[in-house]
Amino acid sequence: ALCGVLYLQTPPNCGAIEFKTKHKREIIYPYPGLLIVFPDDLMHRVLPNEGDGDRVSMAFNFWRMLK
C-alpha cells in the first residue's frame, strides 16, 4: 500500500513533514502543489503549524484490492 499527501496551502511556518527509518531522518518543508507519495510502513509525522495561516492538505491511502 502507498500513502500520500498533497499540499494545497502552506503559509510561512506551517510545519514540515518528517519521515524516519532506523538509520535516517528526512524533513520536507511543504509548498503549494507538492505531492509526496511513500510506503505505508514508513514512519512519519507532521510537525506543528506555528504560523498564523491554515495549512491545507489532502492525505490519502492506496491499496490493491484482491478479487
Predicted regions and their residues:
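Catalytic core of non-heme Fe(II) oxygenases with the double-stranded beta-helix
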Residues: 1-48, 53-57, 63-67
